[in-house]
């Protein structure tokens, strides 16, 4: 797999916090190798969508249907589960607690990864996230905690819980001082792109 360099990456962004952010990985073999040891490695299908193609004015439009990946019904199945799989490959996941905030799909990946590797998942949800989604997380073994009216509130609570309870923060967002895990998480999606 290869990628195209963005000639504007970093331009106009003279901020020291951006310096340590690594270039994106294009290594699809690593996620496939690690994930196929635990999860079904079968590629997800491409689905033609003629109606949408017509609406947007193109001849053909194909959509990568990720709903069945890992049985999650989620388009973000690969990311967090891959991070936990990498920890497991180093013998560092079993019994570990992972904490995150989610407004949807990311939490399912954390829960599935934790469940697969004998870890614990704690997922913070804002009060506005439907209870049906909380039930889906619980069905994957996650402990669900409610905090705040918006995602940012639940993210702050997850970060605080990581510190207070010795849990491993696994966010799909990055910020100054927290980029290694999100970078690894994004590497997991290389598997999807290679398909």
Q: What are the residue ranges of the model-derived segments?
A:
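PLP-dependent amino-acid enzyme catalytic core
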Residues: 1-195
